[in-house]
């Protein structure tokens, strides 16, 4: 095994190669500073998914079946009805609101009271007369109280909901029919806040500046969500006013910044956010593109760095419905974990950085068309075989998270890089710059879509090693705090929108996931989004997610004195303690 001395040796080698810590370096003269253009890499064009293949629909249908089998009813309180009202006369002078309420109450069994929203009242007179007093109403019927949210002259006006996963790096949404659950559109885009920092800490610092709260809120609400929802509604052929419920799953900081709430307490000891759960908000309160009275549901947070994206994801994983111990891992800019079973659950978060989603990687990108999502390298020729997101014949544009896992694992397996992530073999696919920094060429300029070389450098590899080390050290700390180890795990669920799937063997090979039976691993995709979908559709799912959040114990890693030692030890391939990865020794 390797000790911490290797870490200091590595730092000495970096210094000898010309690397310096910018925070402790004073320039003696004019210098040129190169800053990675992280923002432009993630503010790429919005992608609206083609649902005609049925792949996305199949995923969400399977979710519905699984959670229903666990006792969750996919029903909600939304109702619609077509009403033919008596037209007013000089002898029948009942006002429009009372006339509509009377006919609406008769249309539903058990309805004891009718309420109209302000939005409905404003448009009521014109709509009734243009429709000759035959209209469709849309609203909710809860405990006998009918709340009419909209009145339409169209007798078949649709009833839609929207589910959104707001990630630190990427935002993804789906549009659904609230009655049937059918998906009609999906879209994703980079989080507009990325230009203010790649991680939540930098964004919290930015929002603390003059006008910062408004800037950060506008970046996610106006620059990201508004066009995202508009694109989905256009794809589905409906106006945004037909969206009557919105569920958003995001981390604690993203929730605060979306609502324009000061997030600074999240990063200050004792790390207490303004809220964990906030209900009763409507689209008009937030300025969200939907029916003005549409309910905005936020999946509940459970800690300063474990938010609604994880409560929604833990719900989707169904670890709460199992007797055996399971581990749920969400690979994102903030790596979050949940461990437990039906009796208890514990959660924690670690700052993995944006590498899992292609950030801080020279040729990194989100998992959209042109992303290299899988890599295989021939040990003798060192030539790569690439799997690329997109239609047949798609040329590579960059590399996404799953592809980065593969290429680093393959470089290590073929002995092209050492356990420190440095290049130790030469070949036509390995090149070095004027400073001696090595890189592996995945695609030459002629082979790529952009006409630029696609490669992974030693700096990229180092960034990713730190990201995987954050995940593995968090797993170790969480389990050891319970006097357990990885041998107790019966299931390991991996989530995150980093590609169409993860090669679990390679994830173990680089030391990101524990070296246990590979059959125990399952990739679930974007569970934050699928959990938000369930909450948007099902009142029972909302109650269950709230219950999970209230019963989940939060573990603050930043105050654990052992975490940094565990992290440093994991900053090698696969780890300084090779005995933790017996399969890599056999290789």
Where is each model-derived feature located?
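Nucleotide/phosphate-binding catalytic cleft detector across ATP-hydrolyzing
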Residues: 9-163, 168, 180, 217-218, ...
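Glycine-rich phosphate-binding loop of actin/hexokinase-like ATP-binding domains
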Residues: 164-168, 173-201, 265-278, 312, ...
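N-terminal phosphate-binding loop and adjacent alpha-helix
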Residues: 192-235, 360, 371-376, 463-466, ...
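Phosphate/pyrophosphate-binding loops at sites that engage ATP/ADP/AMP, CoA/4′-phosphopantetheine
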Residues: 225-244, 475-489
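Catalytic phosphate/nucleotide-handling subdomain of diverse soluble enzymes
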Residues: 341-343, 484-548
């Amino acid at each position: 095994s390797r000790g911490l001395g290797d870490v200091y040796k590595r730092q000495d080698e970096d210094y000898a190669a010309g690397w310096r810590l910018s925070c402790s370096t004073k320039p003696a003269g004019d210098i040129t500073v190169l800053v990675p253009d992280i923002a432009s890499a993630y503010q790429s064009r919005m992608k609206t998914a083609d649902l005609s293949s049925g792949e996305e629909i199949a995923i969400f249908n399977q979710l519905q079946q699984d959670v229903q089998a666990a006792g969750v009813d996919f029903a909600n309180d939304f109702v619609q009805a077509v009403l033919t009202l008596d037209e007013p006369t000089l002898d029948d002078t009942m006002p429009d609101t009372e006339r509509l309420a009377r006919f609406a109450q008769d249309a539903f069994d058990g309805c004891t009271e009718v309420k109209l929203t302000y939005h409905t009242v404003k448009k009521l007179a014109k709509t009734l007369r243009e429709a000759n007093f035959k209209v469709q109403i849309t609203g909710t019927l809860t405990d006998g109280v009918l709340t009419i949210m909209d009145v339409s002259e169209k007798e078949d006006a649709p009833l839609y909901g929207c589910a959104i996963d707001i990630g630190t790096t990427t935002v993804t949404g789906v549009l659904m029919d609230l009655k049937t659950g059918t998906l009609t559109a999906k879209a994703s885009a980079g989080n507009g806040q990325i230009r203010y920092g790649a991680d939540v800490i930098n964004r919290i610092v930015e929002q603390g500046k003059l006008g910062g709260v408004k800037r950060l809120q506008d970046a996610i609400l106006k620059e990201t969500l508004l066009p995202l929802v508009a694109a989905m509604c256009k794809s589905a052929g409906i106006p945004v006013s037909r969206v009557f419920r919105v569920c958003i799953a995001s981390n604690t900081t993203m929730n605060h910044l979306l609502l324009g709430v000061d997030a600074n307490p999240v990063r200050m000891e004792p790390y207490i956010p303004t809220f964990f759960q906030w209900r009763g908000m409507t689209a008009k309160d937030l300025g969200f593109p939907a029916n003005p009275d549409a309910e905005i549901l936020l999946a509940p947070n459970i800690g300063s760095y474990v938010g609604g994206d994880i409560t929604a994801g833990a719900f989707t994983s169904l670890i709460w419905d199992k007797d055996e111990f399971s581990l749920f891992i969400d690979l994102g800019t903030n790596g979050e974990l949940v461990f437990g079973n039906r009796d208890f659950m514990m959660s924690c978060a670690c700052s993995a950085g944006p590498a899992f989603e292609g950030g801080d990687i020279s040729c990194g990108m989100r998992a959209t068309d042109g992303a290299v999502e899988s890599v295989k390298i021939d040990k003798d020729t060192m030539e790569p075989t690439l799997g690329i997101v997109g239609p047949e014949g798609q040329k590579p544009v960059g590399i996404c998270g799953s592809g980065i896992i593969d290429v680093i694992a393959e470089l290590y397996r073929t002995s092209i890089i050492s356990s420190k992530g440095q290049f130790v073999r030469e070949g036509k696919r390995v090149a070095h710059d004027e400073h001696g920094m090595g890189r592996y060429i995945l695609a030459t300029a002629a082979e790529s879509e952009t006409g630029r070389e696609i490669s992974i450098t030693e700096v990229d590899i180092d960034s990713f090693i730190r990201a995987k080390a954050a995940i593995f050290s968090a797993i170790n700390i969480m389990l050891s705090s319970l006097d357990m180890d990885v041998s107790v795990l019966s299931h390991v669920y991996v989530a995150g929108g980093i590609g169409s799937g993860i090669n679990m063997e390679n994830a173990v090979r680089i030391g990101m996931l524990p070296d246990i039976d590979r059959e125990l691993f399952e990739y679930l995709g974007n569970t934050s989004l699928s959990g938000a979908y369930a909450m948007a559709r099902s009142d029972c799912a909302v109650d269950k997610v709230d219950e999970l959040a209230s019963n989940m114990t939060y573990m603050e890693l930043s105050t654990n004195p052992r975490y940094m030692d565990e992290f440093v030890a994991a900053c090698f391939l696969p780890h300084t303690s090779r005995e933790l990865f017996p399969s890599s020794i056999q290789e």
